[in-house]
Amino acid sequence: MINIMFVCWGNICRSPMAEFVMKDLVEKRGLSSCFHIASSATSTEEIWNGVGNPVYPPAKKELAKHGISCEGKRAVQLTKADYEKYDYLIGMEGINIRYMNRITDGDPNGKFYKMMEFAGEGWKELMAGKRNMERAGDVADPWYTRDFSATWRDVSAGCEGLLEYVLVMEADKL
């Protein structure tokens, strides 16, 4: 089983979009039973009295335009225990990585990545050992841009590259 956690600030836009795009990609390849895919927030801003808000309606609508449902998803916060549970923890932007480090007390096993490290040919550079998290851009934040299609493009490119990377790196688990 390959365990992937996508992380953003509130877990109502970018990280749930990534969660459900990735689930869709692995399902289309017939690999759903080989993956556990989830998403979480670094903050509790979208969690009230222990209950997370649902996916932000425009993000949900963008997923639906591409035939993907995120029904039932509610915001949850990343925990220290998640570090041991997941093989890959994918932040949407640099500030997410910073807070992920705080929540989990660091990344001693090199499990943290920025989503855009995998986009385009990025996953091939990672395969070649050419990792540069600082160079990788951030996933467009639709909370501020209101451009959910730009976020869709970033998330899709990142998830496609991540899947290619994982299929090579984790071939023995498939």
Regions found by a protein language model. Name each.
Residues 52-56, 93, 159:
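A structural signal for well-ordered alpha-helical scaffolds and beta->alpha junctions
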